Amino acid sequence: MIKILLLFLLSGAAHALDVASLHPLITDALRQVGGERVKIVEIGKPGMNVHEFQPRASDLKKMAKARLIFASGKNLEPYLGDLEDALASHQVLVEVGKYVPSQKISAKDEVYSCCPSHSHGGIDPHWWHNVRNMERAVRIIQRTLAKADPEGKSYYAARSKTATGQLRALDQWVKGQVSTIPKGKRHLVTAHAAFGYFCKAYGFKATFVQGLSAKGEVPAKQLAESIHSLRAAGIPTVFPEKAANPKILKQIAKESGAQIGRPLIADGSTASYQKMIQANVGNIVAGLRR
């Protein structure tokens, strides 16, 4: 920490670099890497509905001074094309997820996607559920900040090294926690298709049962198929999400013989990436070791 502070003091930066963030997890990463050298305008805040959010005129005004506007990317923010057209010539839009490996939502799972823009073989936008992807994101942010603020290159590099080290430790912690679940029980059942990256990275079979809608209903055939498959597989726990219809999930759990687990944070609308991962993994382990 002393080394990082000295790097900042010696850098001679008179003003912080103005940036804006469209997603809470990106904001967290910006703080980790940018520290005192960046001034962040939080457009996407914790608790937001990332699939329904649209920037307002007041948001555009808030980010007017930002040289860099950071987005999660992978079409999580379908408004980015219009936003980029509205930016000034000195502003640059950075889609962090663009530089992270992608996974597609399969044809059989498209009905369980978060929204139409992510169905029909579209890219799954929830890339952050693989901790190694967030490590990649930190390095992307480091390089982007250093390009805009060359005097801070060493400062950003030092902070990025610290952050990526913490993420590697977090990734190992996740693997250790997952190892306590018998391999035959590593079957993650959630409402919508948001945990594909997590399941691929940490050895789970993913099943989605209703799609993302707090009000919408599930077609009878789809509901019956979900109940039958969960009952046949002996799934002990299904996991709710804040934005999904709790009534439907309760019905699926009751008729399949499963229990309702603790809710998972699917869309990253939280202030701390590490706390989100720890909470999700803790809830998954508690539910599947029953």
Predicted regions, residues:
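Short, Lys/Arg-enriched, disordered terminal segments
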Residues: 1-2, 290
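Sec-dependent N-terminal signal peptides
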Residues: 2-13
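Extracytoplasmic metal-acquisition and chelation regions
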Residues: 16-290
